[in-house]
């Protein structure tokens, strides 16, 4: 498949749903539905005609998606394997690099490559070189040669250089991938209960672009290039045990708010790029916010509580690296406490 924004939106959604809807899954195999190509990388024509700001947002979002499944083993006990058959180039190899284990078939057409420098005179945009040298510990001289080779590296050399973890004969590839996935699943000590369904977000967009969620309102002031984000505090007591939290599902306050805030950040980033100032306000009872946080932390070893905490970590990181001027206003009636105080 081709690494485009639409593909990464779907990939991000899949990774999130694997954590919340299928916590019983221990190994995820990432492979292509086509025989001759694993992933061809970014849509060069799309990027060639795109504004610089869109390119920045595209690369930032795709790297955030890769960071999410790269950390899935440590944070959620889900191991990602890249089963590479065919060309794996540019953003396609960066997809594989974020996995915990890369398996490459040994045939005449399968290779890994970062051809951005020889083809486009730009560096890989979503962490390719960093993961090659810092994560996979490829020698710097080999990394220099590798990123200057348009044709990439195949077979035994890819394994010898550390660009992949395994090279498998084509006739044994599918069998070996399945075997390796079973081995990794068997070695996992991940314990999880029944997953929850992540339903559609309740989002309404008015004619002037203002946005309303169930827990967030966003007002746009285009004259002053400003977006005012108002977060509502909880109204009810929190679930106090894992069973109650699971029963609440995607309607539990901290999970619902995290999903809505994440969606709001991405919407403003990609669709309202002229709004350079974000003002964040809160309304509600700070004591009740603290109660919700304390209840979640008291059961943090429960799989769903852990996933909600990990989601908040990702949302706050996304906010932190967003290229906007962001101001938080703490005033009478606000509820910047506990988890919401992290926004400050």
Indicate residue ranges for each PLM-predicted region.
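A structural preference for short, pocket-lining loop segments at secondary-structure junctions
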Residues: 4-53, 63-83, 105-109, 226-229, ...
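Charged, low-complexity, helix/coiled-coil-prone segments
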Residues: 1-10, 79, 104-105, 117-125, ...
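Amphipathic alpha-helical segments at domain termini/boundaries
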Residues: 2, 39, 94-98, 137-249, ...
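Conserved catalytic cores of soluble enzyme domains
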Residues: 54-192, 301-343
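Generic detector of short, locally flexible boundary/turn motifs and exposed helical patches
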Residues: 45-47, 107-111, 131, 191-197, ...
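Short charge-dense sequence patches
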Residues: 10-19, 106-111, 125-130, 202-218, ...
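Short secondary-structure boundary/capping segments
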Residues: 43-51, 98-100, 165, 245-248, ...
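Generic, ordered loop/turn and secondary-structure boundary motif
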Residues: 39, 45-48, 113, 120-124, ...
